[in-house]
């Protein structure tokens, strides 16, 4: 199984996921914004260093070009800020895993509450605010 793993070196605990994937036989293709040290490198079949792992559009474009011609089985990100970019890559490559829509339901807390309420469960009253004026309006409601 060939796995693209986003940010295998940060946060530090991601190194253990990288090691675990390799130890169970996965071919791990790492993507991150810093060079892997020799200890981590031994668990990576290949590594793509990008200028900023947080630049979604750039990461998607670079990964797309980098894996061209290789079969990929999974795209994983265990660090919460990267789960949407992982979902976008999965959708682009037609791979299994959570979709962008599903992931947004976990990342966007207002959307999460709306979905839980739509399923018939009670949730605390809440609304999205984007400004100080919105905060005061919410408090007065």
Range-by-range predicted roles:
Residues 1-102, 107, 111, 133:
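ATP-binding N-terminal substructure of ATP-dependent carboxylate-amine bond-forming enzymes
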């Amino acid at each position: 199984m060939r796995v693209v793993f986003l940010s295998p070196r940060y946060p530090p605990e991601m190194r253990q996921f990288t090691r675990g994937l390799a130890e169970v036989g996965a071919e791990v293709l790492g993507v991150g914004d810093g060079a892997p040290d020799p200890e981590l490198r031994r668990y990576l079949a290949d590594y793509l260093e990008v200028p900023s792992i947080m630049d979604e559009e750039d990461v998607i474009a670079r990964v797309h070009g980098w894996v061209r011609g290789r079969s990929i089985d999974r795209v994983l990100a265990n660090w919460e800020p990267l789960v949407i970019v992982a979902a976008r890559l999965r959708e682009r490559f037609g791979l299994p895993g959570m979709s962008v829509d599903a992931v947004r339901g976990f990342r966007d807390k207002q959307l999460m509450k709306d979905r839980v309420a739509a399923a018939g469960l009670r949730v605390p009253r809440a609304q999205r605010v984007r400004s100080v004026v919105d905060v005061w309006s919410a408090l007065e409601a």
